[in-house]
Amino acid sequence: MIHLLDLCEKLNSVDTKNINMFGVSRGGMMTYETLREDRRIHKAVVVAGVADCTMNYEEREDMRSLLTELIGGTPEQLPEEYSRRSAVAWADEINTPLLIFHTTEDDKVSIKQADKLVKQLKKNQKDYEYVTFESNIHGDLRKTDVEKIRKWLQT
């Protein structure tokens, strides 16, 4: 993502003061990581984003072998690697306005992850909005949410 931002700066047709980012699920995790590493994003929207890799490991038994392989070990073996990938551990470093959506019954990424992140964002007085609604569909958005995103990005 950061290389794409570098490319955008070289293009005359891109308003580099108004680059927004949108991520769903693991893409949400990547959005959080980009916001931590780079300040060029104007606003970001995250839907059902992974915010706590250790919690994700604990809650998703079906993903444990994949996470262990990708990260190189378990949370017990490599706590710093899981923390490095978890926005809840460094929410104080996020300085980009965030619009976060999460469904209450998401069975892929627990709403507890979003709640935990929002608690840290609030504690650190960050600029965010948090929208939850009843649904068990991972990454679900309602028509009204799409309109909210459009308006929010334009302000």
Model feature map: region roles:
Residues 1-12:
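Alpha/beta-hydrolase active-site loop
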Residues 14-24:
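Alpha/beta-hydrolase fold nucleophile elbow
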Residues 28-39:
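Short glycine-enriched nucleophile-adjacent loop
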Residues 45-55:
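Active-site nucleophile loop of the alpha/beta-hydrolase fold
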Residues 54-90, 96:
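Mobile cap/lid helix-loop segments that gate and shape the active-site cleft of serine hydrolases
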Residues 94, 100-102, 106:
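Short beta-strand/loop motif that positions the catalytic acidic residue
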Residues 107-113:
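Conserved alpha/beta-hydrolase "acid-adjacent" motif
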Residues 115-155:
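C-terminal catalytic histidine-bearing segment of alpha/beta-hydrolase fold enzymes
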